[in-house]
Amino acid sequence: MRTAARSGESGGMDSTQNKALIRSFIDEYQTGADERALRRIVHPDVIDHSRPPGISPGIEGVREQFDGFRAAFSGFRATVLHQVAEGDLVVTHKVFTGRHDGEFAGVAPTGRDVEIVVMDIVRVADGRIVEHWNCVDRLGLMMQLGALPIPSGAVPSGA
């Protein structure tokens, strides 16, 4: 991918602007499903270091992932809990919520309300997301869906 900025530089945007850009992406695309926001904010050749198997690279992979979440979880939305930025990097701790009423990861709809805890790191260059890393509590999600047993005495988020 070619960008004008190197790691540590964000193409003239400061940390506050980078955080606002990521908030816009979360509100307008992840929650709002606005395709224009996706194209405006995410570089076409974004590198997703956490891309699941079978998902396309680049912006198309971002679209595939969120189309899948929206198909599986009605009312899908993101709530930002914490956000910090330094230079061209923005870290966001957030929770996705929704009702499981479509198949997800081979699990038939359960009708359960779920919470998916996520930590994202994104790199911004020239006003666009160019790189992404994340940690998703997939284990907790699968326990909420009943696909995995809940360890004795444990209560997963969303339960």
How does the language model describe each region?
Residues 1-159:
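C-terminal and inter-domain tail/linker signature
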